[in-house]
């Protein structure tokens, strides 16, 4: 299994093409699949943060592929990539290998793997968390979770994160990159504010569906953030 996560930024008159990509890419993949087994086209929060205000200049495209070869063929030949290269001002792609995943996304676990691998002591780890928020719990979610997400950057071992969503307000996700698993776990399980919110999501049943996945970063291309450019 091979996963690509692309972030593309559009500016000026081309901002409209970022917005239109949400519909156009669905049509293009319907016409030719290129070996995609799971696809998510998502907007992002303001400046890429986990914010209720959208950032119309930045869009994220996540695809799960049958193999790396299928992605390479897509990269070279697809109209989707030609579109991104033509209209975006900058873009980067992270290449990921799922190692651990539990939960559901649209009724399935797209990152489920039978491989049993652990992360090395100093190996970069990429984490994706996503949830479908119950309508009557949305206010509770937006009062609590964004503040926690903003604490990412203040925590030791943090490298990068982006808040994204496939449906405004109700279907949200965060992708974050950490120096290693130890730093990630320290934030997720030992930081008091984060633990309290996690307990609320469960006891108050904020989500109708959720998923948590960990990936190995196996490569990247494009204008990657400086914090992860040397990985």
For each feature predicted by the language model, list its residue ranges.
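A common structural junction motif
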Residues: 79-85, 195-196
């Amino acid at each position: 299994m091979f996963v690509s996560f692309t972030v593309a930024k559009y500016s000026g008159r081309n901002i409209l093409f970022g917005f239109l990509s949400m519909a156009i890419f669905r049509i293009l993949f319907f016409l030719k699949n290129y070996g995609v087994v799971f696809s998510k086209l998502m907007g992002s929060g303001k400046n890429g943060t986990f914010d209720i205000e959208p950032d119309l200049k930045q869009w994220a495209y996540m695809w799960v592929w049958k193999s790396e070869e299928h992605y390479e063929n897509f990269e070279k030949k697809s109209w989707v990539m030609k579109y991104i290269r033509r209209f975006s001002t900058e873009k980067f792609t992270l290449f990921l290998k799922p190692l651990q995943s539990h939960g559901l996304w649209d009724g399935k676990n797209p990152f489920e793997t039978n491989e049993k691998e652990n992360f090395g002591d100093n190996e970069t780890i990429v984490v994706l968390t996503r949830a479908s928020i119950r309508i009557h719990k949305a206010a509770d979610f937006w009062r609590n979770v964004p503040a926690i997400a903003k604490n990412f950057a203040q925590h030791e071992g943090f490298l990068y994160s982006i808040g994204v969503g496939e449906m405004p307000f109700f279907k949200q996700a965060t992708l974050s990159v950490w120096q290693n698993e130890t730093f990630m776990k320290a934030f997720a399980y030992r930081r008091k504010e984060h633990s309290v919110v996690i307990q609320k999501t469960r006891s108050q049943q904020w989500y109708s569906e959720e998923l948590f996945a960990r990936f190995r970063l196996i490569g990247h291309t494009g204008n990657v953030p400086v914090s992860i450019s040397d990985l």
